[in-house]
Amino acid sequence: MYRLAKTTCLVCMLLMLIPMNASAGIKGKKASRFDWTPVINAIIEVESEGDAKAVDKSGKSCGCMQITPLLVKECNRILDLRKSSKRYSMKDRFSVRKSKEMFLLYQSFYNPKNDVELAIRSWNGGINFTKRGTQKYYRKVMSKMK
């Protein structure tokens, strides 16, 4: 069990070193220069402590970034609007790489100015978040980025 936990932590740490930019899911689209890696890593730490197999109590949010079925559906809608044939499935929520791609796709659509605060708050409270409702989460994520 210890060996499995150690291996899982090592894999998650290695995956966190892969730089991410805001062009996920768009073939032929020039990558944004903004590096979301610190934000993504902090969200992963807050959401699941790096556990790619994490499932919340309700069973709806899954994976290292605790992605909901609604977010998968929204990512597929964005891909459809962009005339992409790529689609995400529910099981993709358990893939660290695909979870990061979904985050980047969501940000590229709803947060084109790469506003870190907007990214963190909307990841927790949805696109219609309230500052009050996301304040605790925002502070947690920001503390992990320092």
Could you describe each region identified by the protein language model?
Residues 39-81:
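Secreted/periplasmic proteins that engage bacterial cell-wall peptidoglycan
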